[in-house]
Swiss-Prot record:
Binding site for substrate: F794
Keyword Cell inner membrane attributed: no
GO terms under biological process: cellular respiration; Mo-molybdopterin cofactor biosynthetic process; nitrate assimilation
EC number of the protein: 1.9.6.1
Residues reported in the UniProt entry to bind Mo-bis(molybdopterin guanine dinucleotide): 83, 150, 175, 179, 212-219, 243-247, 262-264, 372, 376, 482, 508-509, 531, 558, 718-727, 802, 819
Natural source organism: Escherichia coli O7:K1 (strain IAI39 / ExPEC)
Gene: napA
Cofactor note text: Binds 1 [4Fe-4S] cluster. Binds 1 molybdenum-bis(molybdopterin guanine dinucleotide) (Mo-bis-MGD) cofactor per subunit.
Name of the protein in its database record: Periplasmic nitrate reductase
InterPro entries per UniProt: Asp_de-COase-like_dom_sf, CT_Nitrate-R-NapA-like, MoPterin_dinucl-bd_dom, Mopterin_OxRdtase, Mopterin_OxRdtase_4Fe-4S_dom, MopterinOxRdtase_cofactor_BS, Periplasm_NO3_reductase_lsu, Prok_molybdopt-oxidoreductase
Length: 828
């Protein structure tokens, strides 16, 4: 076959990506340039991280056979990372689930039974009985759902409606609680609105990049390629990388900083002090657009109330703050001197000064990037607030090339978990369940009785685990997540509740994950392009894709499962009489009729789909379900700074960044000339706050919940690797990716290994106060911890590192700190 120059370039791009991971070019990638005329191509966002790369999906004879970077996608511009090139293979693992499985003994459900194939009707029969029993005997607080930042937008919206409006339970939370909750609360406290003000276009205009707890080289490799290009093409561009251990992003760093865990709070306050002491405040910006507040301190660690650390806290969980003067703020940060900071963090003084100078230099455009190092932190909200302080002091915000940017880890942690409001405390478009006006807006739009949505915040992720263990949460449905592997403190706080005979656990998943195997009922689930979907990425870009193949066997999408299950409940079975009396016309109706088959949702006919276009859910129901749900959801944000474009526009575009007003997307929010909500002459307006001003918070250093001591003498940090995504439930089923990194290892400093008579390749028992795992010693390679710290990825189901981690959370965001606990090592 003769190759065009473009095809040749594509083939080389595939080969280069594979070589980067030490792999040979797979047949699926070679299909990019082979037999193109026999392959049908369509666009989709990548299934993996929150970058939101665009890919072209090749289908042939009802299967996904190829994938390539979409050259028209503005995020990745035709390039994929190694995971992206192997997307087709995640769908065809040998153990793909194709029918519901229920634990049974002697022909009926039994908690100790074996998984047995059943029909969907049988599965829903059992679920219906369990839900109705729990609702009748103990009320809405006895049921719960754990969802995902991998849900499509309409799946998350449908789930939120079912639980908050249908079952009247706010006990629904996404796995984004474990990764982005601190970012959400940080945004809301400082700006009054969620999500970044900038976009990826900043990369090509920035003079300096500062990574705070973000290994972008492995976790956001496509963005890292753009940063690398910017750095290597411009000699005046600087890269600083801060972490508790050395990783691949350090290879590009001009200033690579290793600091003692938790002491990033000290560094952030030191930089603020440096800016003030060197008269580097942007006085015009600061005086017009900023307020100062002092936050409550000694707020605890989000542990059970009986824990000694919670009992000792003076202000457990307090989000309080009070106004303060500039002089008081200046005095507050003045304590964080260069000498004190160097002593507390272990960072050399010259490196600290170099870092501070980047922010203080008025001629340098600076972008701050962060991910889990900041967010998975018992003071993660504070860390977010403190980095905003630096940009607000200097006015380096909401303009091309400079600003703070919280990166996301999941493809729709922003678009679904945050914007839709699938958290236990949220509603669409930054509204919250505790606000009566917000509840009223939702109830009127959904045409349900006033008072239907509970005012009480539901159980967050870690609280759900505790409630299951305590027998207070009895029916639990998880979708699109593998929390038995990904969540903290498995032995003490998660597994006991899942296996408690009082509780019934449902897991919807394409594969038999650790979570699925611990459940009572497994529902086989369609994935990615086996359904029509939409994701929202880290730069506020909403992207759609069409269903391109059908799911295997009886696997069904999460959306189908939610909508069909809602048919099993009539309003009289879930709502009290006083609610029904307010809307008697809803008596006798099913939740399906009340929530999904409404005049507003069902008004878009199936005929809007192309004749040959797959859409299993809509064709079965007789109306364009996805469009109806999206347009209803989008109504909440339009006119309120969260404007989404009309549904059809997204199928034509490679994503659009909200707010989309008059057909135009927004690259930079809050600044005049860029944001349609900022009027001429206002300059900047942080319109999430009533007075249009952002907040600088005075917040101190406070120690970690657990630190090394004489017995447990090492810090443990957990995270990911390039080749695998999260718990590896998809990537470990790709043979090439599995071979590239087949099992987790314990990265350790050579001197720490030597002191314990350990050598590279030895088996080692890693022990915390909560559990133990056996791993393999690695003293070389990509991750190089300092003495006193070990690092272990969590993708390996055979090495459940979260048996070791502590379920301490940020008390404000309820996000778990997976980066800091104490362990000891024992040679095996």
């Amino acid at each position: 076959m003769k190759l065009s120059r473009r095809s040749f370039m594509k083939a080389n791009a595939v080969a280069a990506a594979a070589a980067a991971a030490g792999l040979s070019v797979p047949g699926v990638a070679r299909a990019v340039v082979g037999q193109q005329e026999a392959i049908k191509w369509d666009k989709a966002p990548c299934r993996f991280c929150g970058t939101g790369c665009g890919v072209l999906v090749g289908t042939q004879q009802g299967r996904v056979v190829a994938c390539q970077g979409d050259p028209d996608a503005p995020v990745n511009r035709g390039l994929n990372c190694i995971k992206g090139y192997f997307l087709p293979k995640i769908m065809y693992g040998k153990d793909r689930l194709t029918q519901p499985l229920l634990r049974m003994k002697n022909g009926k459900y039994d908690k100790e039974g074996e998984f047995t194939p059943i029909t969907w009707d049988q599965a829903f029969d059992v679920m219906e009985e369990k839900f109705k029993t729990a609702l009748k005997e103990k009320g809405p607080e006895s049921i719960g759902m754990f969802g995902s930042g991998q849900w499509t937008i309409w799946e998350g919206y449908a789930a939120s409606k079912l639980f908050k409006a249908g079952f009247r339970s706010n006990n629904i939370d996404p796995n984004a609680r474990h990764c982005m909750a601190s970012a959400v609360v940080g945004f809301m406290r400082t700006f009054g609105m969620d999500e970044p003000m900038g976009c990826y276009d900043d990369i090509e205009q920035a003079d300096a990049f500062v990574l705070w707890g973000a290994n972008m080289a492995e976790m956001h490799p496509i963005l890292w390629s753009r940063i690398t290009n910017r750095r290597l093409s411009n000699q005046n561009v600087t890269v600083a990388v801060l972490s508790t251990y050395q990783h691949r992003s350090f290879e590009l760093a001009d200033n690579g900083i290793i600091f003692t865990p938790q002491s990033d709070l000290v560094i952030l306050n030191y930089i603020a002090n440096y800016i003030i002491q060197n008269n580097a405040i942007n006085q015009d910006f600061f005086s017009k657009h900023v307020n100062l507040r002092k936050g409550a301190t000694d707020i605890g660690y989000g542990l059970r109330p009986t824990h000694p650390l919670e009992k000792a806290a003076k202000n457990p969980g307090s989000d309080a703050s009070e106004p303060m003067s500039f002089e008081d703020y200046k005095a507050f940060v003045a304590e964080y001197t260069l000498e004190k900071t160097a002593e507390m963090t272990g960072v050399p003084k010259d490196q600290l000064e170099q870092l501070a100078q980047l922010y203080a230099d008025p001629n340098k455009k600076v972008i701050s990037y962060w991910t889990m190092g900041f967010n998975q932190h018992t003071r993660g909200v504070w860390a977010n607030n403190l980095v905003y302080n630096l940009h607000l002091l200097t006015g380096k915000i909401s303009q091309p090339g400079c600003g703070p940017f919280s990166l996301t880890g999941q493809p729709s942690a922003c678009g679904t978990a945050r914007e839709v409001g699938t958290f236990a405390h949220r509603l669409p478009a930054d509204m919250v369940v505790t606000n009566e006006k917000h509840r009223d807006i939702c109830e009127k739009k959904w045409n349900i009785p006033s008072g239907t949505i509970p005012a009480k915040i539901g159980l967050h992720a870690v609280a759900q685990d505790r409630a299951l263990k305590d027998g207070k949460l009895n029916v639990y449905w998880t979708m699109c997540t593998n929390n038995m592997q990904a969540g903290p403190n498995i032995n003490e706080e998660r597994m006991p509740g899942w296996r408690d005979p009082r509780n019934f656990i449902i897991v919807s998943d394409p594969y038999p994950t650790v979570s699925a195997l611990a459940a009572d009922l497994i529902l086989p689930t369609a994935m990615w392009v086996e359904k029509e979907g939409a994701y929202g990425n880290a730069e506020r870009r909403t992207q759609f894709w069409r269903q391109q193949v059908q799911a295997p066997g009886e696997a069904k999408s999460d959306l189908w499962q939610l909508v069909q299950f809602s048919r099993r409940f009539k309003t009289e079975e879930v709502w009290p009489e006083e609610l029904l009396a307010k809307k008697p016309e809803l008596r006798g109706k099913t939740l399906y009729e009340v929530l999904y088959a409404t005049p507003e949702v069902s008004k878009f006919p199936v005929s809007e789909l192309a004749e040959d276009q797959l859409n299993d859910e809509s064709r079965e129901l007789g109306f364009y379900l996805q469009k109806g749900l999206f347009e209803e959801y989008a109504w909440f944000g339009r006119g309120h700074g969260h404007d989404l474009a009309p549904f059809d526009d997204y199928h034509k575009a490679r994503g659009l960044r909200w707010p989309v007003v008059n057909g135009k997307e927004t690259q930079w929010r809050y600044s005049e000339g860029n944001d349609p909500y900022v009027k001429m002459g206002e300059g900047y307006k942080f319109y999430g706050k009533p007075d249009g001003k952002a907040v600088i918070f005075a917040l101190p250093f406070e120690p970690a919940a657990e630190a090394p001591d004489e017995e447990y003498d090492l810090w443990l940090s957990t995270g990911r690797v390039l080749e695998h995504w999260h718990t590896g439930s998809m990537t470990r089923r790709v043979p090439e990716l599995h071979r590239a990194f087949p099992e987790a290892v314990l990265f350790i400093h050579p001197l720490d290994a030597k002191a314990r008579d350990l050598r590279r390749g030895d088996k080692v028992k890693v022990v915390s106060r909560r559990g133990e795992v056996i791993s393999i010693v690695e003293t070389r390679g990509r991750n190089r911890p300092p003495q006193g710290l070990v690092y272990m990825p969590f993708f390996d189901a055979a090495q459940l590192v979260n048996k070791l981690t502590l379920d301490a959370t940020d008390p404000l965001s309820k996000e778990t700190d997976f980066k800091k606990c104490a362990v000891k090592l024992e040679k095996v």
